[in-house]
A protein has these predicted regions:
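Short extracytoplasmic/periplasmic juxtamembrane "stem" segments immediately C-terminal to an N-terminal membrane anchor
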Residues: 36-53
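Extracytoplasmic/periplasmic/luminal assembly and interaction segments
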Residues: 55-99
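Aromatic-capped interface at the extracytoplasmic side
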Residues: 25-36
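N-terminal positive-inside, membrane-proximal cytosolic segments immediately preceding the first
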Residues: 1-7
């Protein structure tokens, strides 16, 4: 009788452990206050020489419809010869986060091609850009402070 109870207890504990581990890896996605995350990232990135992009610019540069995203923030350089850029996105789904990441990769590659041959400083910044996907958030940064912005982004999550 004790053996049966002990065996049953082991099975229940194992089942509980499996449920706990599954919950950790497949639980609900983290959600943070986007305005706070944006502020923390923006503070490190800075806004001097930058302009905020609208939904039309987001679509033109990334092929992404801003109305389909949960939240987004885009900064681009005021100077056409500068490549500094920041895109912070809260996506509505994991699939969408992957699409935004791919769009950021394509944007970086397009910019490299645009500046190849006559803009070595710009190409170097693009080579060192940060594209970070932390479901449901995506960060794209082209800046001398890209790693610092990434750190602020990860800390804010």
């Amino acid at each position: 009788m004790k053996d049966v109870m002990l065996q049953t207890a082991k099975i229940l504990l194992l089942g509980l452990f499996v449920i706990l581990v599954w919950g950790i890896f497949h639980g609900s996605r983290r959600r943070v206050d986007f305005a706070v995350l944006r502020s923390e990232v923006q503070e490190v990135f800075g806004t001097s020489g930058m302009k905020e992009g609208d939904a039309q610019l987001l679509r033109r540069l990334y092929g992404v419809n801003g109305g389909e995203l949960a939240n987004w923030y885009l900064l681009t350089a005021e100077d056409n010869m500068a490549v500094e850029e920041l895109l912070l996105v809260e996506c509505a789904s994991s699939e969408q986060a992957g699409q935004v990441r791919l769009a950021a990769e394509k944007r970086a590659e397009t910019q490299k091609n645009n500046f190849e041959g006559y803009g070595p400083e710009q190409v170097q910044l693009l080579d060192n850009c940060v594209i970070q996907e932390e479901d449901p958030y995506v960060l794209f940064v082209v800046s001398e402070l890209a790693q610092e912005v990434k750190t602020a982004f990860l800390k804010g999550l």
